[in-house]
Amino acid sequence: MDPLIAGFDWDEANRGKCRKHGVSAAAIESVFQRPIAVFPDPIHSRGETRFNAIGRSGEGRHVLIVFTARKRVDETFIRPISARYMHAKEVKYYEEEAAKIEKR
């Protein structure tokens, strides 16, 4: 995990939304322990900036996470909004893009 991130901001609402898609809090947190790609999501950012992260869980499954970063005093916490396992087309695209980056 990025040393600037102090931890995760969980409550029953965001845990439930992630569980609805079959992704546990542990799987989501494990994605942030590994290399990930993060993209801003200006279309869905209302009031606070949302991001999309794609990466692999500790189990090796490809995960898409929608999250925001929340400041508390001088620390930043990741607040997952939703997460799901990526579809086959998304995995293929992710793997192709990752291969291009590795060749650089």
Task: Indicate residue ranges for each PLM-predicted region.
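Ribonuclease/tRNase effector modules and their secretory precursors
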Residues: 1-104
